[in-house]
Amino acid sequence: MTELMRIAALFAATALAEIVGCYLPWLVLKEGRPVWLLVPAALSLALFAWLLTLHPSAAGRTYAAYGGVYIAVALVWLRVVDGVALTRWDVAGAVLALGGMAVIALQPRA
């Protein structure tokens, strides 16, 4: 597995944990779903925080690069979970964001 693939997979897992951790409370508050969903939401957000510690860069750089992957994963969620078709603007934005992530994450280390 290349370094970019490893970083992207870790970022994708991190984004998924964050999205699930935020989506479940949204279901409780917006859709009237059972309150017990807040328990797996809290666990998912704890997993999200732990996954962030596995990234090799300084926290600020990790968060900056992570943002690009989060955008792409959120758009996949929009399509798969919410059932909303992506526009070419969604795809273009995700490509730009992932390009920015790659520049930040793969910069030469001094």
From Swiss-Prot:
Its main location: membrane. GO terms for cellular component: plasma membrane. Pfam families: UPF0060. The chain crosses the membrane at residues 9-29, 34-54, 66-86, 88-108. It is a multi-pass membrane protein. Keywords: Cell inner membrane, Cell membrane, Membrane, Transmembrane, Transmembrane helix. The keyword Transmembrane helix applies. It is found in: Cell inner membrane. InterPro entries: UPF0060. Belongs to the UPF0060 family. This is UPF0060 membrane protein Bcep18194_A4425. It comes from Burkholderia lata (strain ATCC 17760 / DSM 23089 / LMG 22485 / NCIMB 9086 / R18194 / 383). The lineage of its organism: Bacteria, Pseudomonadati, Pseudomonadota, Betaproteobacteria, Burkholderiales.
